[in-house]
Regions:
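Hydrophobic faces of well-ordered beta-strands that scaffold small-molecule active sites
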Residues: 79-83, 119-121, 145-147, 184-188, ...
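Short cysteine clusters
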Residues: 33-40
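Conserved radical SAM core fold
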Residues: 86-91, 125-130, 143-164, 190-198, ...
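Conserved C-terminal portion of the radical SAM core fold
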Residues: 169-245, 300
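Well-ordered, non-membrane alpha-helical segments in soluble/globular domains
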Residues: 57-67, 96-105, 163-173, 204-222, ...
Length: 322
């Protein structure tokens, strides 16, 4: 049974101190996710252990959207909503039923106030194949189906729940979404330094090359998706951990706690700057060589402007891709 939310459904995303703002609003139509990915911040937060789904129709969601659009006063005409931050968008079919209601509410208000909206549904599941009625896009409201992708060895190591789709099925889901007329996006978030072959300088270089080989192979395997005219955006982000996550994972000897991780200005642990820049630059250069048109649709998530600059990537917002 869906609950009534006591706080806001819609909030501007707080990226953290110094992190580039991509212009998203987060829609908390549900909270928590029991897929159990080892790196997910929800496992280490105060989120309920059992996922909670909110009743949008009985709550204040419609009023919040109305206020947001009406108060923009022409200054903000493009809105990007992320419905996959506080839970997996397609965790269950009941989740999707609430999402469908949410999309229709936003569509109605967008037409009323003459604004354009993108709504991102983000998932690691293959539940899109179970959906009977796919939401349609129109001029005012476009739905983006995004899949979080990782090499299969990373999935098997850190995403062990049997409800999580293997890599190939996630890519198949993207193709299916395209066939249904949806826009699609790919999120390589988080890029995880795995396997670690050793801690000497030479061994870290070797591990980096293995990582890059695996992620380039992943991108190659979905090149048809990347080259689709309905492809919206590609985002890269290496692993980041809260202080509490890092402490817990380090205490239990998790392979997520790579020794070359440092506390950043936003209070999150990340790989060292040289490692992050190397990974991003190599993947960006790969995209430039295989699908150069995608550079204008490529972003770094949860990164600082000096990292974008070091990678020679122009800072952009998701709303600029409308």
């Amino acid at each position: 049974m869906a609950a009534i939310k006591k706080t806001h459904y819609v909030e501007k995303y707080n990226y953290g101190s110094g992190v580039v703002d991509l212009g998203e609003y987060i829609i908390s139509f549900a909270v928590s996710c029991n897929l159990g990915c080892e790196y997910c911040y929800l496992r280490y937060s105060k989120a309920p252990k059992k996922p909670v789904l909110y009743n949008l129709l009985k709550g204040n969601f419609s009023e919040e959207i109305e206020i947001l659009f009406s108060s923009s006063s022409g200054m903000e005409k493009n809105f990007y909503f992320n419905a996959g931050e506080t839970t997996d968008s397609l965790l269950t079919m009941v989740h999707f039923e609430e999402l469908y209601k949410m999309i229709e509410i936003i569509r109605e208000k967008a037409k009323k106030y003459n604004v354009k909206c993108f709504i991102e549904l983000r998932t690691k599941t293959e539940n899109i194949f179970k959906i009977g009625k796919i939401p349609i896009s129109d001029e005012s409201t476009k739905v983006i189906y995004t899949a979080t992708l990782a090499p299969q060895n990373v999935i098997e190591k850190f995403e062990k729940d049997n409800r999580i789709a293997p890599l190939q099925r996630r890519i198949d889901g993207l193709r299916y979404a395209l066939s249904c007329g949806l826009l699609v996006g790919i999120r390589l978030e988080p890029i995880i330094f795995y396997p670690i072959t050793g801690l000497s300088y030479k061994e870290i270089l070797n591990s980096t090359q293995i990582l890059l080989t695996n992620y380039k192979a992943l991108l190659h395997s979905c090149k048809d998706v990347l080259d689709s005219e309905n492809f919206h955006s590609l985002a890269f982000s290496t692993l980041r951990l809260t202080k509490e996550q890092y402490r817990i994972l380090k205490d239990k000897g998790s392979e997520l706690c790579f020794p070359e991780m440092f506390l950043c200005p936003d209070g999150k642990y990340r790989y060292s700057r040289p490692i992050r820049v190397t990974i991003y630059k190599e993947l960006i250069n790969y995209i430039k060589s295989t699908s150069p048109q995608l550079i204008n649709k490529t972003l770094l998530s949860f990164e600082f402007d000096y990292i974008w600059e070091a990678c020679k990537l122009k800072v952009k917002k998701l709303t600029n891709l409308l």
